[in-house]
Curated annotation (Swiss-Prot):
The protein's name in its UniProt record: Valine--tRNA ligase
Domain characteristics, as noted in the entry: ValRS has two distinct active sites: one for aminoacylation and one for editing. The misactivated threonine is translocated from the active site to the editing site.
Coiled-coil features, chain-numbered ranges: 813-873
Gene that specifies this protein: valS
Organism: Helicobacter pylori (strain ATCC 700392 / 26695) (Campylobacter pylori)
Primary role: Catalyzes the attachment of valine to tRNA(Val). As ValRS can inadvertently accommodate and process structurally similar amino acids such as threonine, to avoid such errors, it has a 'posttransfer' editing activity that hydrolyzes mischarged Thr-tRNA(Val) in a tRNA-dependent manner.
Length: 874
């Protein structure tokens, strides 16, 4: 029989899929997956921000999911009944666009299909292609309760959306009104935060508006000359002496000769342009408010597709942006254009299709800002905490400026607004499809054609996924809402603080009377190693799936957590990933070494079972690492947790404990137990290698024993500070002795003996001597109280080490040092500072650099001369 040879390096691709499938199949990711270690009344709930059903895993997702999964795994191991709730967002605009393009490639328009047939096509696409991101999450090791995956268009969630709408409608918090909205001619109405502003180079057009006498004119500056057809007035500041005499008179609208009044309002900035502005209430947010104050007519000059209408005269049927150049040309022809200036300004674009957004008066459904008042007050009372804490300032600033939230969208795909109107114009909200009007019993009913903003349904995510309003429907577990609302923690990117987090806060508080979570952790953005935003055009995008393929999921998870310093953007490079793959390999080698050396491994869970000094020291350091890891995780300091685990496992365990074990062989079993416990600390960050190495050290296989993920997380136990200090002194002495050897050993000189002077006494100097002789590779190390007469020394933190020079032939070392002095002398000459002409004529920066180099060379020269003086003493 051919025996399978064990790999000599860590191979993540060989174990990750197998481990994940076993753990998933056993139900470890579910609410009661850790039932054996659950503690009474300990609950933890974490909601996955639902990615778009159209989405693929990008590095931002990978960061959010890694941090969430770290926390979920930690809480499971710590005895919490844990719900890590996954799901998908129906992504109204994005999904409709995907399916529309697919149909157009077949020559089919959605309008030809009609609403019902188009929605069927979307559901077909969703079942076939949607949700690929969920499978990609599993590659990352995400341990969400996938059997409970929710979709914002699920039957249960649709009911919650209708119920929320009904409750707010009945309270007067949802209204329908004509209002100025952000309008995308492709995607319809957008909320304020769905508009992305970009700085653009444009033009400022100075247009002449003649007065009624047709002799005098006013000049008005505008960036959008095509909107002049919607002007209802000209406006000046009442304090502007240039125009006071004109207030109350009329001006003639260029090109179409309609008369408009000249009004005064302090809204006008006298310094901008000419100090006289056009007022277009139908197509400007500020002008809309001015129009209401002055009772001006609101004129819409284009339709929902951006096509100019009859108000625009000869320009009717032109697209709004296409019309601009033609309007400017006609103004020039009629001597109505004073001048054009270059002008840089902010232009709003649709966050989805990047179309230029227009202010547009439209009849839409809105949620009133009053809905948020109670949640704002509770945040002020500290009932939810932001991490980092400075994000509360951003939240407060935005909430102070909260405007009515436009929730209606002109789409087919989404939650159709549950408002019905009968033939007698009675309007009502219904949770189910009504048979008749409750007011007049008319059976001729029409449902509102618009759908709700995607963020409306995702704003209910914290409780709609738990069965709110339909606990007894059979679609949800009856106890879910009671057990897991409020949720415990929210982890997401700061970029959706206003899109999603703020809305969840006020939606949840308004409907359930409690904030949806206690802690809100907002992470920064992932950028490239130079700190630049990743983009396909720059070619600097890091694909998480490719990184998993190359470096393993553990390396990616650990790297992202390690770089996630509070409040700072993450600068990610493949060097980080390579380093952490090396870290995984270091652990693999350490476990392989211990397994090779051990005769038998026995679990040693209790502190008093650690008998050897090295074992007790290693356990004490493990207890320290446990305390730090727990504290870091409890306070969302993911980078601190990874830093200390890296330091403990590589810097202490691999670099020192393993080395010490070569002297103290009987500690091998105990070091194995320490490493197994340390792997539990590491598990939330690196679930695959921790699982694999734990079983390797235990001589077990995951296939026939419990997973590390449902074992208790190590407890914070007492440390032996006295023993720890003793080993710190030993380590310091070894490092100092090694430096001494490097300084002295020049063939044929071999340092065989050295001595150590301690700044303060330790209990066991024999242990120090034993370790120092073996690990510094010396035949003899003495502990002394005074410096030998003829010796060279090295100074450590806790010690000073000495090499006696009396019995050594130092001539090779002296020759080496003299050669170094000659080399330094040549380097000094190359600096040219002895040359008066150079010093006089060299640029200041060059001269300063040369002087700095000379300073460094002189310092080296001084040290070498000191060593030579010591070595050449009689």
């Amino acid at each position: 029989m051919i025996m399978k040879q064990e790999p000599t390096t860590y191979q993540p691709e060989e174990i990750e899929k197998k481990i994940y499938e076993i753990c998933s199949h056993r139900g470890y990711f579910e609410i009661d997956g850790n039932e054996a270690i659950q503690e009474k009344n300990k609950r933890f709930c974490l909601m996955m921000p639902p990615p778009n059903v159209t989405g693929v895993l990008h590095i931002g997702h990978a960061l959010t999911l890694s941090l969430q999964d770290i926390l979920a795994r930690y809480k499971r191991m710590d005895g919490y009944k844990t719900l890590y709730q996954p799901g998908l967002d129906h992504a109204g605009i994005a999904t409709q666009n995907v399916v529309e393009k697919q149909l157009l490639s077949q020559g089919i328009k959605k309008e030809d299909l009609g609403r019902e047939e188009f929605i069927k096509k979307v559901w077909e696409w969703k079942e076939k292609s949607g949700g690929a991101i969920l499978e990609q999450m599993k590659r990352l090791g995400v341990s969400a309760a996938f059997s409970r995956t929710r979709f914002t268009m699920d039957k249960g969630l649709q009911r919650a959306v209708k119920l929320a709408f009904l409750k707010w409608y009945e309270k007067g918090l949802i209204i329908q009104d004509n209002y100025m909205v952000n309008w995308c001619t492709k995607d319809g109405a957008l909320s304020d935060i769905e508009v992305e502003y970009e700085e653009r180079k444009g033009a400022l057009y100075y247009i002449r508006y003649y007065l009624e006498n047709q002799k005098d004119y006013l000049v008005v500056a505008t960036t959008r000359p095509e909107t002049l057809f919607g002007d209802s007035a000209l406006m000046v500041n009442p304090n502007d002496e240039r125009y006071k005499h004109l207030v109350g008179q009329k001006a003639i609208l260029p090109l179409i000769h309609r008369t408009i009044p000249i009004i005064a309002d302090e809204h006008v900035e006298m310094e901008f342009g000419t100090g006289c502005v056009k007022v277009t209430p139908g197509h400007d947010f500020n002008d809309y408010e001015v129009g209401k104050r002055h009772h001006l007519e609101t004129i819409k000059i284009f339709d929902e597709k951006g096509i100019l209408n009859a108000h625009c005269g000869e320009f009717e049927n032109l697209e709004r942006l296409e019309a601009r150049d033609k309007v400017v040309e006609r103004l020039k022809e009629n001597a109505l254009l004073e001048k054009i200036e270059e002008h840089t300004h902010q232009v709003g674009h649709c966050y989805r299709c990047h179309n230029v957004v227009e202010p547009y008066v439209s009849k839409q459904w809105f949620v009133k800002p009053e809905i948020a008042q109670s949640s704002i007050e509770k945040i002020q009372q500290g009932l939810a905490r932001f991490y980092p804490s400075n994000w509360i300032n951003n939240y407060n600033a935005w909430m102070r400026e909260l405007r009515p939230w436009c929730i209606s969208r002109q789409l087919f795909w989404g939650h159709q607004i549950p408002v019905f109107t009968c033939e007698n114009n009675h309007q009502f909200v219904s949770l189910d499809t009504p048979l008749s009007c409750p007011t007049c019993k008319s059976e001729t009913l029409e449902q509102d054609k618009d759908v709700l903003d995607t963020w409306f349904s995702s704003g209910l995510w914290a409780f709609s996924t738990l069965g709110w309003g339909q606990e007894k429907s059979g679609l949800f577990n009856e106890s879910d809402l009671k057990d897991f609302y409020p949720n415990t923690t929210l982890i997401t990117g700061f970029d959706i603080l206003f899109f999603w987090v703020a809305r969840m806060l006020f939606c949840s508080e308004s409907l359930l009377g409690e904030l949806p979570f206690k802690d809100i952790y907002l992470h920064a953005l992932v950028r490239d190693e130079k700190g630049e935003k990743m983009s396909k055009s720059k070619g600097n995008v890091i694909d998480p799936l490719e990184m998993i393929e190359k470096y393993g999921a553990d390396s990616l998870r650990f790297t992202l957590a390690n770089l996630c310093a509070t409040g700072r953007d993450i600068k990610l490079s493949t060097t980080h990933l390579e380093n952490n793959k090396n870290f995984a390999n270091k652990l693999f080698n350490a476990a392989s070494y211990l397994k090779l050396k051990q005769e038998s491994f026995k679990d040693k869970e209790r502190l008093n079972e650690y008998q050897t000094p090295l074992g007790r020291y290693a356990k004490s350091r493990l207890n320290s690492a446990t305390k730090e890891a727990r504290n870091a995780l409890d306070n969302y300091r993911f980078n601190d947790a990874t830093t200390l685990l890296y330091r403990f496992l590589w810097g202490e365990f691999c670099d020192w404990f393993i080395e010490f074990s070569k002297v103290e062989n009987e500690a091998i079993d105990e070091l194995g137990s320490v490493l197994k416990e340390a792997l539990k600390l590491l598990h939330p960050f690196m679930p695959f290698i921790s699982e694999s190495l734990y079983h390797k050290l235990s001589n077990t296989e995951l296939e026939n024993t419990e997973s590390i993920m449902v074992m208790p997380y190590p407890k914070d136990l007492a440390q032996d500070e006295k023993l720890e200090h003793e080993f710190e002194v030993i380590k310091d002495c070894i490092v100092s002795l090694r430096r001494l050897k490097i300084m002295l050993e020049t063939p044929p000189i071999v340092l065989k003996e050295a001595s150590v002077g301690l700044r303060e006494a330790i209990e066991n100097t024999e242990r120090l001597q034993t370790y120092a002789q073996k690990l510094a590779r010396l035949e003899k190390v003495s502990v002394i109280s005074s410096k030998p007469l003829k010796s060279v020394s090295d100074v450590g933190e806790f010690c000073q080490t000495y090499a006696n020079l009396e019995n050594l032939d130092l001539s090779p070392l002296v020759a080496r040092l003299k050669k170094q002095l000659e080399k330094l002398e040549k380097e000094k000459l190359k600096l040219n500072l002895h040359n008066e002409n150079f010093v006089k004529n060299a640029p200041k920066s060059v001269l300063e650099k040369a002087k700095e180099s000379l300073k460094t060379l002189l310092e080296k020269e001084s040290k070498i001369k000191q060593e030579l003086d010591l070595l050449e003493q009689p």
